[in-house]
Amino acid sequence: MEKALAYLGEESVITRDFHTIEQADKVILPGVGSFGVAMDNLKRYELDKVIHEVCERKVPFLGICLGLQLMFEGSEESEGVEGLGLLEGKIVRIPDTYGLKIPHIGWNSLHLQNNGRLFQNVPMDAYVYFVHSYYLQAKHEEIVKATTEYGVTIHASVEQDNI
């Protein structure tokens, strides 16, 4: 992320410091790994609290991969572990009943819908790279801005207010 932002001419700070995040004018929560472990780490450093605070103040917030999953209410990957609950819906495992390989690794076309801000300059059905075993199911279809197909319709991107 840091190199991509630098390439775009944006300054960034990698931190888990509450006050640094609290003062940021934009926040990105990337992530790779386990939903439960990630939530434990957010709570350990009180980052769950500062994430709620910046989102309530309408600071632009981008969750990428696991960072996006954590914004939801929970995940089948870590039953009983609550997510941040900033978006309604859940994270579910891609079913292996279709004979598809799990994890899903590879290029898929992105189907844009509902006029998302993030993909304004991306053509319909552009190919993007996926590496995942779980995907999000947003409770409200109107926040879904991009989907892809991998045995099931996968909500690949959502937007709600500043998130």
Task: Please report, for each region that a protein language model flagged, where it lies by residue.
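Short, charged N-terminal beta->alpha structural module
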Residues: 1-6
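Structural alpha-helical scaffold elements that stabilize or flank donor/cofactor-binding regions
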Residues: 20-21
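An anion/phosphate-binding loop that grips the pyrophosphate of nucleotide cofactors and donors
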Residues: 24
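Structural motif
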Residues: 28-30
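Cysteine-nucleophile active-site neighborhood
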Residues: 33-105
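Pocket-forming structural segment of enzyme catalytic cores
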Residues: 74-149
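A glycine-centered loop/beta-turn motif at secondary-structure junctions
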Residues: 139-140, 148-163
